[in-house]
Amino acid sequence: KFLQIAVEEHYQSFDKNNIRDVTDSLWRSKKTKPRGAADPNEKIINLVNDIFGAGFDTVTTALSWSLMYLVTQPHSQKKIQESELDTAIGRERRSWLSERSMLPYKEAFILETVPTWQFVPFTIPHSTTRDTTLNGFHIPKECCVFVNQWQVNHEAELWEDPFVFRTERFLTDDSTAIDKTLSEKVMGKQVGLAWKSALGTRQWEVSFYLSTLTPNWSSAPGGESKKDRVRPIYGLSMKHKRCEHFQVKKRFSMKSSN
């Protein structure tokens, strides 16, 4: 109901010369299509709901898992810090999102957190718009469908050592860029336009988070074993066991802003 009201308010205050956000963009798209071809209002509300839902719990979960993997994969943390951020960006400023291509190992690290521990094992419910057949199975129109992302992202035929955290798998042979072909196999990118957009935003946020935190700070584990730290807690989105002992240290003396 909250999102429905917000979307309708956008419609009432819509100005084609002042596109404020994605909701306005959806209304503009609707208004520019011929009568009969435009998306119904309900579909726009559902699209906004998908984007809102995909960016709410999953972003915080992704941030939490990425921080946990910085702790449990110290060699990856060190490589992000020393081989990329210190070298490509320097210590005098923060990196920009437009510079992500200069930090391929960091981006590969983010990609690796998705299949290793799939934050959302099953997608939210989808519905078929027509009768269809998939791999010999008949799926009728308006059938509720859940996609098992966990299975796809841990399929041995698609992934080498799917349960092993290995950042390098997403890099090209010369380690200078992301392997586009392999990265597109990550199921999280293939569950619909709205979710794809939201997941792309999630990846930007995690990238920004790591680029802000790791240049100046190093994260280290406390007393638990590595196995205990990454033990998952199952739910609609999968979280890790709470880490009771956690250390964050300055990498070097920071200059005063005064």
UniProtKB/Swiss-Prot annotation:
Keyword Transcription regulation: no
Membrane topology: Peripheral membrane protein
EC number: 1.14.14.1
Catalytic activity: an organic molecule + reduced [NADPH--hemoprotein reductase] + O2 = an alcohol + oxidized [NADPH--hemoprotein reductase] + H2O + H(+)
Main location: endoplasmic reticulum
UniProt keyword annotations, A-Z: Endoplasmic reticulum, Heme, Iron, Membrane, Metal-binding, Microsome, Monooxygenase, Oxidoreductase
Protein's job: Cytochromes P450 are a group of heme-thiolate monooxygenases. In liver microsomes, this enzyme is involved in an NADPH-dependent electron transport pathway. It oxidizes a variety of structurally unrelated compounds, including steroids, fatty acids, and xenobiotics.
Transmembrane feature ranges: none
Localization of this protein: Endoplasmic reticulum membrane; Microsome membrane
Pfam family, one: p450
Family: Belongs to the cytochrome P450 family.
Cofactor requirements of the protein: heme
Induction: By 3-methylcholanthrene (3MC) and estradiol-17-beta.
Protein name as catalogued: Cytochrome P450 1A2
GO molecular function, one term: heme binding
InterPro entries: Cyt_P450, Cyt_P450_E_grp-I, Cyt_P450_sf
Gene Ontology annotations for the cellular component aspect, listed alphabetically: endoplasmic reticulum membrane
